Amino acid sequence: MLQPKRTKFRKQMTGHNRGLALRGSKVSFGEFALKAVARGRLTARQIESARRALTRHVKRGGKIWIRVFPDKPISKKPLEVRMGKGKGSVEYWVAQIQPGKVLYEIEGVSEELAREAFALAAAKLPLATSFVKRTVM
């Protein structure tokens, strides 16, 4: 599972997930990409689950890039614990996603195979996504 090796602070404030993705919105490495259309959060488990679906479908052909990393800790208090007594411990890690963010990239496979693989991966994610191709200028 993806998570930072070390952080400056153990816990973070909730914060807001506003705006559009300015960085990481272009296809940089591969030929085809899966791009987020909606905003939300991706947990480390969801990122890994979609990655497995991708790699299983393309088998040994092609190279895959994961363009998101879960770097925000989400804390949770245990069940049946009264309010107060401080903030809960870190339960899992998420990546905050804005519309336009490229999530996965792939190269070395046909467009048809890439579309099928990304459709399987998108089914594992809680966001609306779209298939994009690299534009050569």
Swiss-Prot record:
Biological process terms in GO annotation: translation
Transmembrane portions of the chain: none
UniProt keyword RNA-binding present: yes
GO cellular component: cytosolic large ribosomal subunit
Family: Belongs to the universal ribosomal protein uL16 family.
NCBIfam families: rplP_bact
Protein name per UniProt: Large ribosomal subunit protein uL16
Naturally occurring in which organism (per UniProt): Pseudomonas putida (strain ATCC 47054 / DSM 6125 / CFBP 8728 / NCIMB 11950 / KT2440)
Annotated gene: rplP
